[in-house]
Amino acid sequence: MWNLKNQRSGFTLVELAVVVVLATSMSALLAPTLKQVRSQGRAMSSEGNLWTIGQASGMYALDNENRIASYSWRAGETYINLSNGSSFTPSSDQDAAAFQARDILYRATGRTAGQFRILTPTSRLVHRRYSHLILADYMGSVSDRVWVDPNDFNQAVWQDFPTFYDFVPYGQGLPSSSGYDNSSSWATNSIRQMWGFGSSYQTVPHAWMSDELPSYAPISDTPHLFVSAGGSPHLGDRYHNEVAFPASKVYMFEEFDRERVGAPYFAYGYTNPAKLMFDGSINTMVTRAANDSVSPFDFGSGSTWTQRYLPIDKFPVPIGGLGDSTELNMHYRWTRFGLQGIDYPTPSPKVFSR
């Protein structure tokens, strides 16, 4: 028979102290690993987002004469304002696209009147940061998480609270610190309202503009704002069959490599943000492995286009800190020969199959 009086019911204080020390040490050792695993899991989810977007792009092309999804409203055409039923005729393709973006958001949100009525963002080229709205509208939701890198926590918050303008870039006005993109137009409500419908993924410019001049190009002191180059550009009307090497040409890409410390801008050579190629595959090769960029002001010059990264308020800062003047090769953002060109000579083998 067991002598219950002599049975040990638990740890002694000394043993318990040893267990606590060991558990604490193991937690300290495992914490970075678990953090990396979670980040890598989110990275795979981001690649899955891009794969889904690629499938939707293919379906859009089938339904729209093989067009690459882009704004289709045109200068000189007459359209109806959903907020009041009046008609209007845009004077440029840039303005027409802004009105089309407003129309999409009117229908998606119902915000056609009141304090948070959707305004027309005519002060900006909406193609630059909101080309995805055409495909999002086609997919049925402009606020789907498929447009957000799971590591992009800011964009997730802006999407969840689209009318909390205080949360978004320049919601508190222009930053007091130097080294940010301080164009005053960022702090207007017609721009603030758009962040709730933004995306972590950027569309390459040649998906919505010509491979030749006239076109658009970044202004000298920031990669975020564009100006027309060589005249009045015709926007949109690009087709998938114009892409000469679909497996080697980037279509959309993570603007930041958020799986790395500091979430560096895609143009740093050592980064490997996920990239959706025109054939629907996912490329995770490092940026420096891509071919050099070409000047968007002179596509025939052969000169490599470099530019410093100037952060938007609430965006990741440069690797060298605010004010970093390092010139970065923009690689696949400005592809030599546009849709006819090659970004990665050796295509990435990563292809999602679901």
Describe the role of every protein-language-model region:
Residues Q7-R38:
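N-terminal single-pass transmembrane signal-anchor helix
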Residues T33-L50:
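Aliphatic-rich helix starts adjacent to a transmembrane/signal segment
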Residues S46-E47, W51-R354:
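Short, well-structured segments within or immediately adjacent to enzyme catalytic domains
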Residues M1-N6:
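N-terminal secretory signal peptides that target proteins for export/translocation
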